[in-house]
């Protein structure tokens, strides 16, 4: 596939997961999210010309399929719609060929973001990357293509709406008349995220590179229960399932406040409902479960939280993550692997739910299996998904193996099923009754404390501090609901805080104590939270290169090496420029995730490595870094007296 004519129009990129995908592509990665692919049946006897005609109509209907994604002169995401695309229909025969065809990455900056093939029996293989469409948008493509093929076979006009909404128009609206809503949303989340529990799970030592434990439950009982509760509660099935999942997590992990990201499609307006685009974004959703609420009360609280959050979902995704990153640095708590919940429950209305039907009678027909994976898109610390197939509810969980084992993961999906089933059978479910359904819930040990709505392993934090080469002794304690770290070291609080937040804990959460009490070798005692950071000059070639790249890409005057990329004023859409400037100066080794994290520039410089450069047919190395040890008592720039001055601020043209 290739573009065969010039550009028809250009515009910014609409807000959604597509922005994160764009950022990955711009920095050389093959995208953050899986590529969508379907085999679409071609009606028997339909000619190749007719199939090509259906595909032509699909490409003309949806501009996004004729779009390349690159950056404008300011480095911002841009989509350019081409007049036509040269379409190829290669034969895809056999499982290996199909896998290669569907998994080969796209070059979305220079080639069409869609791929068509034909199977041995003549069916169409359709492949699109996530930057083109989320699951809802991709399904629109499949249904439109199916209808266009049927119309060709039946020699009639396709039964599609006259006009399809286009992403460029949505993006222009967001950048112009919709900007006020964007700003309001960002202000809301800047405040709300301050109180967002950093993780569902206990905060303890994670394993970088750990597998993901998967549990897949197929339940006719839960399908009937969901249909029954939908009728009796007159409530959206997605809300019902989400309430059950929150209840199950609260019981399983001994929590009374939970925050998850609800994958939410920005399709509430007629202008976006039928749009093929990547419009999904995460809705941060905090639900308070204090007072041991019944299932119906959890549902009520959840619906209220959704209403509040839903009023503030018009944010720009990259700007949202910038705001969130600054909040994380301020709070001293960071979750590298998201914790998300997703519901796709179309077809629930066809599940029979007659009064008197007892879903408990179907529990014996449930089937659960566990497995493990470790793919590039296994980024979540927790991912819960619910969907319907022929009246059976499928509940899938994917959890970092540092947190749970196979039995625990299976127990979570079974508990969610049980809560739905027993709530449907009884009309409601008391919290104590829901607790009795759990077979092996987690409970804290002696050195665990509840702080800021999460359980924290004090020994984990103590041991992590002791891993710093300049720390002689450390002890983390809970004092009046806050964490205090007593440390013997010639360091400043911000250095210890930065060490904790920059240490690789896999997908699991990291956090810093609220207060440090540091006993120095000169007998002086230094105390503080480590939130305030000094103006710190670069030392060595790597630090200087990183500072110059950050400042040059973002037009910053003098960013402190003690600050994080986002707190010194770095912008996410300019990360590709930062990395390019680093390469030009002879360094590599960090990526988007590093610059999004609450890690200081000085710590990030420690991850840089020399690039191997070819000169005259021989390999030479870029300038080496002067030192690679962790930060151990850095000096501040002149004028920062105590080292604690805070930062401000184929074939056919279509």
What are these model-predicted stretches?
Residues 5, 30-50, 109-127, 205-269, ...:
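Gly/Ser/Thr-rich phosphate-binding loops and adjoining beta-strand/alpha-helix segments
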Residues 62, 66, 142, 256-263, ...:
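Extended, hydrophobic beta-loop-alpha segments that form or line the acyl/peptidyl-thioester binding
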Residues 2-3, 43-60, 76-111, 224, ...:
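A short, small/polar-residue-rich loop/turn motif at beta-strand boundaries
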Residues 26-31, 59-98, 115-120, 152-181, ...:
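Small-residue-rich loop/turn and linker elements
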Residues 3-4, 26-35, 52, 63-64, ...:
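His-Asp-centered acyl/peptidyl-transfer active-site segments
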Residues 1-28, 52-95, 164-212, 610-654:
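Short amphipathic alpha-helices and their capping loops
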Residues 2-80, 93-176, 308-319:
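Acyl-group handoff/entry surfaces in thioester-processing enzymes
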